Amino acid sequence: MRKLIIPLFVLLLPLSSEASVARRASLPDLVKASSTVVVGTVTQRSSFWSGTRIYTRNQITVEEIWLQGTTVDPQKLTLPPTSPALEVHTLGGVVGDIGQSVSGSPRLVTGHTYVLFLTEGAPNQWHVVALSQGAFEASSEALRPLTQTHALELVGDATAIPTTRTKLRQAIIAWVKEQP
């Protein structure tokens, strides 16, 4: 028996290094950590070096803004006219023939539409909140969390996050309106 367990452990050891572990974020966690929540399509991607890390710059054409600060009123949610698109930086990418992959970081795809929970870094430079937990692929009405495909192991209580665009938006609005 012992002879069988040791080889199995050795075989499984490399698999454990392929994932990031993070505390599971609830919808209130995502909303509280976000400066804005948008629905947008990736129109362009390019990777670049910053120190010893590679980042990917994702140009997002915003279709809808669901949250801006603490505002959920659709008539008050606007992007500045000088920047109709957002620049979202994600960890990892390929520059020349060198690539870096960061487990748990969202990998956005050109032409795909996402619901993104974002926080602003430098002016007009945004980052997805809570690794890939803050990104949902949106095909028409259905949402798919990117945590399912981006090697992110979540720990903590599972909280139900709505799986459609309409229900997620309604849940965000309801939560924000409940706050003092």
Feature annotation, model-predicted:
Residues F48-T61:
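Short aromatic-glycine-enriched beta-strand elements
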Residues V72, D97-P180:
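Netrin-like (NTR/C345C) domain of secreted extracellular proteins
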Residues G40-V42:
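Conserved hydrophobic positions within beta-strands
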Residues S20-S34, W49:
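Short boundary/loop segments of OB/S1/cold-shock single-stranded nucleic-acid-binding domains
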Residues I6-P14:
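Bacterial N-terminal signal peptides
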Residues M1-L4:
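Positively charged n-region of N-terminal signal peptides that target proteins for export
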Residues L15-A19:
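Sec/Tat signal peptide C-region and signal peptidase I cleavage site
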Residues Q44-G51, L67-Q68:
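Short, conserved beta-turn/loop elements at beta-strand boundaries and strand-helix junctions
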